[in-house]
Curated annotation (Swiss-Prot):
Entry-linked Pfam families: zf-C2H2 (PF00096), zf-C2H2_6 (PF13912)
Name of the protein in question: Fez family zinc finger protein 2
Primary location recorded for the protein, binned into one broad class: nucleus
Keyword Coiled coil: no
Record flagged with keyword Transmembrane: no
Role, per record: Transcription repressor. Component of the regulatory cascade that controls the development of dopaminergic (DA) and serotonergic (5HT) neurons.
Domain of life, per lineage: Eukaryota
SUPFAM superfamilies per the UniProt record, alphabetical: beta-beta-alpha zinc fingers (SSF57667)
SMART domains, A to Z: ZnF_C2H2
Family: Belongs to the krueppel C2H2-type zinc-finger protein family.
Additional record remark: In one-eyed pinhead (oep) and cyclops (cyc) mutants, expression in the ventral forebrain was eliminated. Overexpression induced ectopic dlx2 and dlx6 expression. The tof mutant has a reduced number of tyrosine hydroxylase-positive and dopamine beta-hydroxylase-negative DA neurons.
Tissue: No expression seen in DA or 5HT neurons.
Motif position, Engrailed homology 1 repressor: 27-42
Amino acid sequence: MASSLPLETVMSCPRLDDRSGATAAPKSLAFSIDRIMSKTSEPKAAAAEERSEGKKTVGLCSPIPCMIPIQPFSYDLQAKALMNYSEFWKVNFRGALCTSAAMCKTNCGVCSKADAGIKHSVLPGTRVIKPQVIHQALAMPANGSLCYFNYLDSAYQSELLSGHLFSSAIANSQAQAISAHQKLLLLENAKLACVSPEKFPTPQYPHKEHLPGQLDQIVRESHNLTEKNGVKAHSKTNNCSSDGKPKNFTCEVCGKVFNAHYNLTRHMPVHTGARPFVCKVCGKGFRQASTLCRHKIIHTQEKPHKCNQCGKAFNRSSTLNTHIRIHAGYKPFVCEFCGKGFHQKGNYKNHKLTHSGEKQYKCSICSKAFHQIYNLTFHMHTHNDKKPFTCGTCGKGFCRNFDLKKHIRKLHDNANCLSGGNDSSRGHQN
């Protein structure tokens, strides 16, 4: 836990050299490092000077790179968003750099009044830091905010030497301005990070990478960027019109309305029949990659979910829950045309297509038509002699695993044969 005095940054400062009358010697530097690392209070003179000026900056004047690590803070980093610092600096601070002298003025909340280049990018009372060395780790845990930046191995060292680091209080107070600049937010590259305190730099490893691969990043804490209030709220702004009203995206085929264009895009394959994600084992196609990933589980041998009544095992718990409906006789999906009931919604939808008489998926070889595209996919195996599911008892091949199981139940109604047939078919697939 950090000391009670909020640590805003550690930096080199020529003005402090002038006040002390001489450049700090290595011995005094080592003393300062030991004092900070041991979390003891500052010398009385330094503390009195800080109280008189109302500053929070600890100055370490040395020509060598600052190797003082950040102490582990008891901050909840669950809602921290990562933001590329170099992009932020290019947008807000290019051509508006403050000097080292300006950094040491008592009223340097905005560097100086004469430094008009920054304008309203920062607010009075907010520290704007100009780093003096490349290998410098900065932290500003003050008033519930935390910013961290590490210049080590930065790809923008020449520019970042004259860059600025600022507290997230600036961004929090300018929420509307930030929302107006998508480059500033960089939400398309933002990630929510959950970093444990042990990943912060330690005395043994001053520049320990606390965010792997993200040295050129700022960890920015903001209540406006939490997953609930910020990221979702920002995504809503992209789907709102200029007057603030939410946009509606309507499907031109069926008239279904969506609140985001992305959802409309996911919906369109329902009408086009496109199933670009195809299982390499059985050839079944899917509209979404996530559905294909869930489907692949059925081809594995792991079936941890077992039915307590019949002992049948399943890959997923949701499949087991659907299976339990069979024992309970529960068929919640009833066809409004013939009254036939179904345990699963998918089977119900497939059955309804038989009443419509529409078979839009036709085989290019034999012109046989099907209600659904995956039935056509399985049918194509009959033309290329591809039958990935083989019975382990008689060696007969099938295009679908369902047909193999039905064959085993009818002709080889034996539990051992069923187990052997499944194992054999899986071995043939792999």
